Amino acid sequence: MTIKNINADLEERLNEIKDDVINHMNKDHAEANLTYVRALAGMPDATSARITDFDQFRVSLTAETLNGSSNVQVQFLEPLEKSEDIRPALIKLLKHARTRG
């Protein structure tokens, strides 16, 4: 199996869980999303944030401020190697964000 095949397989597995992860994070962890954009995306005045997408390298969010919304991306500290890595990667990213914010 080539690197390209491995990445395609991971992308497929991430797509299978993507909706559930995004819905869960936006419903149950809105404060974590806000911490990501405030501390790691350079938007300290953000009032809310929601995840819109993710891949093995980054999470994409829409951040709201009093001046409107912005789409931002925050890199994971390490690329995901398997779909099961998403939860620990988001937790690790949150812990990192808290040390920066």
What are the language-model segments listed below?
Residues 1-101:
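Binding-site signature for planar aromatic cofactors or substrates
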